[in-house]
Amino acid sequence: MKADGTLDEIIKKWTGENQSTANSAVPTTTTPAGQKATPKKSKYVISSDSSFAPFVFQNGKNKYTGIDMDLIKAIAKDQGFTIEIDNPGFDAAVSDVQSGHAQGMIAGMTVTDARKETFDFSEPYYTANSILAVQKDSKIDSYDDLKGKTVGVKNGTASQTFLEKNKNKYGYKIKTFSDGASMYDSLNSGSVAAIMDDEPVIKYA
């Protein structure tokens, strides 16, 4: 998918940038288009996030779309199997795979040693930094300004790991969310002072 330009085409469609090419952390050894594995099943249930634009989100017709949706459909077509996609949200998608309800998951999941004990990962197709977002009139300019305030983050993400590691240093509280839509709504309503998410997601919001 990378060698023939399919991956870059999908990412550029949603971000305007060839991030997979620009980022050296994304390997070039992904399976070339047309080099098929032998699927064990003719159909797979794939679980995914529900609100993580531009990777996955509902469009104006309430259809899930985005980088992850385009990519998993392209993989299925290239490898000769069909898919049924569920979008229950990040936490529920993880549970779906663990319970066997879904055979796979496509989402913004950081590869960790702990997760490797439970999941088999593909090679990464996108890497991104985590950044903070605040309201336009916020006076928060640095982590030091977060003291005594509440920061929102999605459960089970690299952003949560970072915030947990540094909360005592900067004195903020953490509120976790199971989906991105609720987290962004909380920022807009003022129930959290800031949120942390992947950079392309915040820039797309």
Residue map of PLM features:
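Extracytoplasmic small-molecule ligand-binding "clamshell" domains
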Residues: 4, 13, 39-109, 174-176
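Flexible hinge/capping segments at coil-to-helix
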Residues: 134-151
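Short Pro/Gly-enriched coil loops immediately N-terminal to beta-strands
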Residues: 119-131, 180
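Hydrophobic residues within well-ordered alpha-helices
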Residues: 75, 97-98, 146, 186-188
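Ligand-binding clefts/hinges and TM-proximal coupling segments of bilobed small-molecule sensing domains
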Residues: 2-40, 158-178
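Short secondary-structure boundary segments
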Residues: 50, 109-110, 136, 155, ...
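A ligand-binding cleft/hinge motif common to bilobed small-molecule-binding domains
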Residues: 92, 108-118, 164-165, 188-205
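Short, well-ordered beta-strand segments
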Residues: 44-49, 133, 150-153, 195
